[in-house]
Amino acid sequence: MKVRVYNIGGIVSPLEVELTKGVNIYKAPNAYGKTSLAKALVSLLTSAIKPDDLLNVFANSGYVELDLDGRTYYRRIKRVKNKIMESSKLLLDDDRALLLSYFSPENKLLNQIMSGEENVEWFISATSKINELKSKKEEMETKLHNLQAEIDDLNRKHKEAIELQTKIKQIEDEIARLEKEKESDKVLNKTTQTISITNENKLRDIKEKIEVKKRELEDLQNRIARLDQEIKNKESLASPEIRQSYERQLQEINAQLQKITAQRNEAEIEIRLLEKVLDQIRESEKQHLTTCYVCGSHVDPSIWKVRIDVISKELQEKNSLYAGIKKEADELLSKKSEIEKKLKELDQISSEISKLKMSRSELENRIESVKSTIDDLERQRREMEERFNRNAEIYRVYDINDSINKRIEELKKKKDEYEYELAINGIPSTILNKISEKQKELQEVQKMVDDLEKEYMRRLTIAREEFVKIANYLLKELEFDLRAEIDENDRLVVKRNDATLELRKLSSSERTTLALILVLTALKSYFKTPFFIVDESFMTFDQRRFDKIVKYLNSITDYVIITKSDENIELLKETMEPLASS
């Protein structure tokens, strides 16, 4: 695997590093770009790292390129007229890489564990993507419910269609009987009667057309009224004042976040320094050293206890300050996410309003067309009635079958109504086909719901089970007298001799180990990373324990990359047998 980096972060000269499978140790002086190299590599795994965060602030172009298995992956960035442009081909795009591919002081989980926060529910949710799975399951359950409702509605329509067909057949039989009876009783001039009937049929046809168009007009007017109400409702939710309010809040939060981030970084540096000093003083006190490890002067061994108390108190105060800053930052980030979500919802509502207004315009055009048709038909009806009335005496006939004709007309009108209902409702065979299709779709969705439920339950339990398995294996291998588990409330529980310990009271090495074990659990259970980067500068392990951790990492990922501070620049390939994974 070959990496090329230029003008990314602190790397301002072209850098090329060739890595081999296994453990690679990259040594370089402080401020030489080790962190920038790590960030460049991780940026090929997720677009969550933006090009603005990668490109050196004084550079106009930069790149990170990776050759792996005969393919080249890259992020090439240019600054054009104060705008950042990028072309990219990522190895993968998964924001979990920020948590699961780079273990450094910037790792969010490590910061939480080091501050003594025991709740890891957010980490399990983020790495297992269980919330996405839950949302998908709920979406499928809603679809399942809707499909069942559609099938129930289709069954109702099928029953109604059968009843309508039966009624239509009964009317047709009755009309046929009356027509036969009428033919046998005719006493009038057939030609004269035919003229009268023809005129009546024409007039009836026009009236029926008018009624159909009036029903269509009423339906269109109702639809446009509903659209107006919907537009009004949505416009009340997306007023310019609401958007401006959200944008002002977002600007204020960003300003506060920038200030709090600086405070948090300063507190982190002070805490790491105090923890390192405390560990060294504890070790000096444990060995009853009489020489100061800093200046080399003689020290009374009893003074180590006093120094431990002083440093511990100061560290406690700094941790308390850091926790407050972190809590405030988390609250601001939560508010920022909520406001950004609200702004996206406003954009969606504005888009929907535009579509609704287009639909309304189309309906208005259709209404005008239908009104014009109705006016034309009404004109034809009036002219026809006037013409028929003028010729009434000419075409008037005496017919003993008037009552039969009246009954036939009533039956035909009723039949037209039933046929109109049947046309809207649908014929039985078509409805049966739709029912069959919906039932097949329902079975497929039901299977998806069942599969999602199984996967949801699997992901809920695998994190706890796998963590206990890996944690207690590694804690034993690293000779820490601890046991660890995740309880039903997704809290990290640590015990020694069956006594539950407070996370903040563990040593920095023990807390670092627990954070790393959580990352390893997620790697084995949910996420396959091509490489894993460890910043050794903050690790407080002794070399023997650190080597065992590295061996375990080597067993679950192809490339392990360790960055170390050194006066010289050097890339070492370390040969070691992978520690068998638990």
Curated annotation (Swiss-Prot):
Alphabetized InterPro entries for the sequence: P-loop_NTPase, Zn_hook_RAD50
Domain of life assignment: Archaea
Binding site for Zn(2+): C292, C295
Residues at which ATP binds: A28, P29, N30, A31, Y32, G33, K34, T35
Alphabetized GO MF terms: ATP binding; metal ion binding
Keyword line: ATP-binding, Coiled coil, Metal-binding, Nucleotide-binding, Zinc
Disulfide bond entries: none
Coiled coil: 243-281, 320-351
Record keyword ATP-binding present: yes
Zinc-hook domain span: 243-351
The UniProt record lists the keyword Nucleotide-binding: yes
NCBIfam families xrefs: ASRP
Protein name from the UniProt record: Protein bps2
